[in-house]
Structures are given as C-alpha cells and as structure tokens.
C-alpha cells in the first residue's frame, strides 16, 4: 500500500493537479480570512472556513477524477488487478494520497486562528474543531469522487458526476421541502430506490440471483408496511435524507458552536462505506 500511496502522491504533484488544488483552497481560505477576520474583525475563523465549502464542490471532482478512471482509460488498471497487493490496499493507497493533498491547505488553515489571537480574542476550540469537521467533510467528498471514478473509464465523466453528486448534497437541505409526504408517494420512491440498489448490486457482483433477492425483499417490505401501517411511510425519505445534509454537521461546529461527535462519526461511517463500495467495484472487475 505504501508504494501505491507514494506513487499516487508523486503523480498528483508531478502533474501539478496537487499543487493547483492545494494552492487554490489555500488562496480561497486566505481571501475569506482577510475579508472576514482581518478587515471586518470577526473573531471566528470557522465563519471564513464555511465559505470555502462551496469551492470543494468544484475542486474535489478535479482531484478525484483520475483516481481510477484514468487507470482504466490507459489500461494500467490490469497491472493493479494482477499485482500481489490486496484490493483494499490499492483503494486505501489511492484514497490516502488524495487525502494527503487535501490535508495541506487544512494544515495551513490551522495557522489562521493563531493570527487572529495576535490581533485580539480568538476562539481556538470552535476554530480547530471546525477545521477538523471541514477536513472530514472534504474526505467524504473525496470518497464520493473516488467511488464514482471507479465506475467509469472517463475522467471527464467522473468529474461531472462527482460535481453533480456534491452539488446535490450541498443543496439537499433546500430540496427536502419539495419531497412528497404522502405514503403512496414514498412507497413509489421506495420501489425506485430498491430497483436502483438491485441494479447496483448486479453491476458490482454480476449475480442476478443476489440482485433479484435484495430487490424482491425491498419491494415486499415496502408493500407490507404500506398496507399494515402506512403512517411509517409518510415523509419517510425527507426525514431520512435530512440526516444526509452533510454540511449541517459542519455548521454545528462553525455556527452553532456545538461539538457534534455524532456528526463526525457519520462522516467516518460514510468514508468507510464508500471505500468499501469502491473495493467491491474493483473486486467485480478483477473477476469479470
């Protein structure tokens, strides 16, 4: 894994993607810092950091688009698939390389609260916990991009789909009000979701039986719940998706001044899940 990690880190900086990515986020964070903290005198760097989140939606897809898609495009993925290194080590090596690139501006951000302290009052607990939440949020975004990159051989398609997915999560809080609340509407959404889950399972495993069983169980469960206790389906998906408003966890740190340990665990759980899905996608290609 260490060899893959070093190779990936080297490739990011040799191709300038890593340098541009780190410099871009550092400059954007510095601009917000000057405007809000130095010129306006606002004592919380966490407030400035909130403005950088939008830039992650643009920069992360560029960082993650080549993680697997470029290997498939250049056919160099066959070397990885036939190497003695486990798939978990391959995926983790690539993922940790991207996280390392992202960590550079985050480490630089740690200097800004110290500068605020030189000017007056600083709130280290809020600022540094917000930087931690920002870092983990970025790691989730990178994991999303890596997973989507593993599904295609086109880096451009990987970047576009990642950008679309990140914008969806960014706007999800505003979109929830448009989700239907009736039981029948949520049942239809339930059926569509399990159909997509079945397709995803088949895409990963190429096993029609497993995909069919999972889809069938989902259909039956949804229909049974609808006829037995349909109130459970009312506003079901708007409630569930409300827990996937990833930016709200960060805002708990930066704006509500709450150390949201459960939110950090949510970030870590999503990272583990997406890494696992990427490994399974790679596993399917090894045997196909």
Residue ranges and their predicted role:
Residues 67-97:
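Helix-loop-helix units of permease transmembrane domains in multi-pass membrane transporters
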